[in-house]
Design a protein with these regions (language model features):
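Glycine- and acidic
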Residues: 65-73, 382-383
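Phosphate/diphosphate-binding loops
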Residues: 15, 24-25, 69-92, 400
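Beta-sheet entry/capping signal
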Residues: 23-26, 42-43, 273, 298, ...
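Glycine-rich phosphate-binding loop of nucleotide-binding enzymes
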Residues: 1-38
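Flexible glycine/proline-rich, aromatic-decorated loop/lid segments
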Residues: 35-67
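Short His-Asn-centered micro-motif
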Residues: 28-30, 46, 355, 383
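Long, contiguous, secondary-structure-rich segments that constitute the structural scaffold
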Residues: 82-150, 214-257, 266, 356, ...
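Long, low-complexity segments enriched in small/aliphatic residues
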Residues: 120-368
């Protein structure tokens, strides 16, 4: 219902009025018919948890678990690894006709966490090389640039092979690295090698990872959390950086190697490693930042200490140099130029939140019959009994929840536990379960994300400044879809759109 913004356009990039066009092909891989497969042109059926080999670990506990197939994947379903392996083989075959030869790509990467690039923004002052304020230096005042050579005919060969960089370069994370050259040689005998007749083959004499089980064993063999020798090497590297004695943390497990066969017989506790600042030495329960406090390993911050103040000009501009309380945005449901809603906007306006689900893990299990029977068996929104009473809403009434972004149709759950002025809808309640049509849009109601929109937080775009530097799944911009308001109305008639 929102109208396009015609006034506030980006000023520093070229705005193109003509777009590429609509999405022509959507392919999804899933073991359940969630909302994404329902919209997809092609659905690749995936194996479930107990139909494939895989690894399971988490920062919630110090153990590593295996997945082993109790049965083969049903019908045409395959494991994730086998699906991508099949796709890579098909693409490589097609590339011989459509993309022969090699191509060069220029790839940009952001200034990296735990690297020299953390020093890119001196004194937290950002100067724009594109405006001539500072010299453009790749990896310092601008992104890194690398030339990557692509050969699409060899995608499959590379996919099923553990590549040669492990022989030459160190591996690791969080500023700690070590050589795995010996482990790479071990994997050749453990997993077998490719021996093609073609002397130009990129995979010749290299370890085979053509099955998910082999991939799992390769990961376990080159990880410092499952290989005691590599754990010792990781602490050795951190000792060199800090001058502090650390190798004793994993000394008792230096000769230990955790294999897939080991964890199949019994899940194993991971080996302490310098990659993480915790310590589970001698069976101690893992706790974060143990080595920082007890062994005086500097925190990975600008000062080497726990930091609350960020001396960076962008954080200062947004008033976030220190952790501060910020009130919510004003309760806007529609813009002045947006389409008018049928019947006019309703008086009940609430903050709209989408917390993690109570009867599902993201979209998984949310349509499971057993889980659905634990509550209302369809989409629900929660609001306070005070708000409900003031607007004649009774528990289990059908509601329309809407704003300029979209509409949700769901049953009301009234509760004294909900704060007045707030509504939430547990996330991942897909619209294919008991979702009626909307009286506002004349189409079926949307999912929990229908009223939300994605915002980028500007301070998360800062980089090249000590701990405020990018690393995948560590620090960087996220999709923030909070801080929105919705109007709420009772539905006059529930239409299931079945005609």
């Amino acid at each position: 219902m929102a109208e396009p913004n015609e006034d506030d356009k980006p000023s520093e990039i070229k705005w193109r009025e003509d777009t590429v066009g609509k999405l022509d092909l959507l392919v999804s891989l899933d073991f359940r018919m969630t909302a994404t497969p329902l919209y997809s042109d092609i659905v690749l059926p995936a194996a479930t948890w107990y139909e494939k080999h895989d690894l399971s670990s988490t920062d919630m506990h110090p153990f590593i678990h295996p997945f082993n197939p109790a049965i083969d994947p049903l019908w045409e379903s395959r494991s994730d690894w086998d699906i991508y392996k099949t796709l890579s083989k098909a693409i490589s075959e097609m590339a011989k006709d459509y993309l022969p030869g090699t191509f060069k790509d220029v790839v940009t990467t952001p200034l990296g966490h735990d690297s020299k690039q953390e020093l890119g923004s001196e004194f937290g002052i950002v100067k724009d090389w594109s405006k001539g304020e500072i010299e453009g230096i790749p990896g310092k005042t601008m992104p890194n640039f690398a030339i990557v050579e692509r050969d699409y005919t060899k995608i499959y060969d590379k996919f099923v092979t553990l590549g040669p960089l492990l022989e030459k370069a160190n591996v690791g994370a969080h500023g700690v690295s070590f050589s795995v050259k010996d482990e790479y040689e071990e994997l050749k005998s453990m997993l077998g090698t490719w021996n093609d007749n073609d002397k130009n083959s990129v995979r010749n004499h290299r370890p085979r990872i053509d099955t998910a089980r082999k991939v799992a064993d390769a990961i376990l063999n080159i990880s410092s959390a499952t290989n005691g020798k590599l754990s010792q090497l990781s602490y050795e590297d951190l000792e060199h950086q800090t001058g502090m004695p650390l190798k004793d943390i994993s000394q008792a497990r230096a000769s230990e190697k955790i294999s897939f066969l080991n964890i199949t017989s019994q899940p194993r506790e991971v080996i302490p490693t310098a990659v993480f600042p915790g310590s589970n030495k001698n069976g101690r329960r893992y706790s974060p930042f143990t080595t920082n406090i007890e062994r005086l390993v500097p925190f990975r911050t600008l000062t080497g200490r726990q930091s609350y103040y960020i001396d960076h000009e962008i954080f200062q501009q947004f008033g976030e140099s220190l952790p501060v309380y910020k009130p919510t945005l004003p309760p806007m449901v529609f813009g002045t130029r947006d389409k008018k809603v049928k019947g006019g906007q309703d008086a009940l306006v609430l903050r709209y939140l989408t917390p993690h689900g109570k009867w599902n893990i993201h979209s998984t299990y949310q349509d499971n019959e057993r889980m659905l029977t634990l509550f209302r068996g369809g989409p629900v929104v929660w609001l306070s009994n005070e708000d409900a009473e003031e607007h004649d809403i009774k528990d289990n009434d059908w509601l329309e929840v809407y704003n300029r972004n979209g509409v949700v149709t769901a049953r009301a759950v009234t509760s004294h536990r909900m704060p007045k002025g707030t509504m939430f809808m547990y996330h991942a309640q897909d619209k294919h379960i008991e979702t009626p049509g909307s009286e506002i849009t004349d189409t079926r109601g949307g999912s929990h994300n229908a009223p939300t929109r994605i915002h980028l937080k500007p301070t998360q775009l800062v980089g090249g400044y000590a701990q405020i530097s990018y690393h995948f799944n560590y620090y960087g911009p996220i999709g923030n879809q909070r801080d929105v308001y919705v109007a709420v109305r009772k539905m006059k008639e529930v239409n299931w759109l079945e005609d």
